[in-house]
C-alpha cells in the first residue's frame, strides 16, 4: 500500500468545481477570479481540499484553500462531514490560543453552490511531511534532515499539543462532546463503535478490530483525567512547517472533547504506523522520531501533566486507524480497484502491529 497508487477519492469534475467556485466567490467579491488551482500532493482522503489564488483588489488574502465536504458518490470515509463544526473549531482555536491555525474566511453551509458544504481559509506557506511516499522513507525533506533538526520539529510539535490543551478553555470545547452517557472517554469510544458498525454494515466484519475493542475494555483507565479540546488527527502530516517550526495546524474534522492522551496516543501511533510499514519494506525509517517515552516525558515537562494509560491510548489510536483503513479498503472495492479478500483483516495495513497490541506484546516491557 505504501507504494500503491493513491485510492480514488472523488467523482467530481475539477473544471466544473472551479467554475462553480468562481461564481460563488463573485457573490462575496464581485469580479473575483480563481487562478493557480491545484490539489495537495498528499495528506488526507476524507474532506477534499483545493488550493487556489483569489484574484481581486479587495481580497482579504490571495493564497486560499477550499475545504469541501466529501462527495457522497465517492463512498466517503466518514458518515457525516460537519464543515460548520470544523470552521467553528478553527475560529475558536485562533481566538483562544497561540496555536497557528489558518485564518478562516468564509463558510457556506448550503450544498447548492458546490454540491456540498464548504469553507474557504487562508493557505499556509511551508512544507508538510508527506504521506505518499511516507516521510519515514528515504528521499524527502524530513528524512534528509539532521537528527537535531528532527528533534527540533518534534519538540515544536509537542509544544503545539501542550499549548492547545493548556490554553483552550475546556468549557468552550464541550459542544464537541459525543452523544450518549458516561464520561467523555466512554462517549468517544462508544462513538467509535458506532462508526465501526457503520463501516461494516452489509460487508464482512473484522475479527481483529472487534478483539481490539474487547482489549480496550480490559485496559480501561481507572481515571481518564480531565477532558480538553482534542485536535483529533494529531500528527505531523497535518502540520505545515516553516523550516522545522509549525506554521499551520490543519485538519480539524476529528476534533473532540476528551482526555489529553487521545492526541498523544494518535501522535505516537500514527508515526509508528509509517515507521512499521517502512521497516517492513526493508528500510530503517526514523526510529528515533516521536518515541513514546520521549513524547510522554516532554509533554509532562511542558504541561505538568504526566500522560497515563498510554498502552490503552496507543491501542485505541491503532484501532481507530484500522477502522478508517477498513473503510478506505472497502471504498477501493466500491470503485473496482480491489477485491474483498477471504480474510477481511488482511485489508488492515497494520494488522501485525494491532495484533501485537491486542496481545500486549507490541511495546517493550518497562
Spans of model-derived segments:
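ATP-binding pocket architecture of kinase catalytic cores
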Residues: 38-211, 219-220, 224-226
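Activation of the activation-loop gatekeeper triad in protein kinase-fold domains
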Residues: 250-255
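Conserved catalytic-loop position in the HRD/HxD motif
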Residues: 233
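Conserved catalytic-core element of eukaryotic-like protein kinases
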Residues: 230
